[in-house]
């Protein structure tokens, strides 16, 4: 289980103590919509009264999510299912976060070059927007998330190259949420594209997998690496000048705010839901300039 979710769990536990309510945190052992559904059905059968969920396959889980929403207050966090009957989404603008990651890579590669995108899966709402944000920065497109919400078919295709004047995105490789597959795909990519100049790892375990592949190939500091989330390997690589930076969410707040909102809803306070049905927990870019202070703060949240 990614550190990201352990930090989110710490936020849930803190909120459960503050609001004196019982909270269970369920983390499926694999990133599978089938396993997720089974785990959720099992816990619903125990008589829970509300749920915060990060849908693994938003488009294909709508009917099932709606069936849950008919039984109890249901909110989404981290990844959204905007077409479902969820009451609110707690998380960040993944498109803006993707753009922040793209900016890190662009700054590290002023001459441009070939870039590889690595991500767990593209069925999730968060991953689609995150990937597109990176692409649009490298392609010099001045857009916001609304462009894609209004034109859901405008996302770049997942196959083939995407080119601008100086950047070529050679491919988007997926690993279905498996770090060992992410490592293998990164190693293979370094052989397939020997002229590669940059890599963006868009799920928590992707930057460490890419880092290991670069280290094994003797290409650290030769190929720029930008990432997502706060894995210790990623933060150490930033500190050592071997990773240009990472875009971090605030999983502690995802957990804390999810419990707070569900508690308010169960108390009958529907005013807790904003008109936008979106509670924004803004992302941050972590680079060599601020990695030390951020890491100290992270250790405090994790109780280390």
Positions of predicted regions on the chain:
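A residue-level marker of the well-folded mature domains of exported/periplasmic proteins
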Residues: 1-304
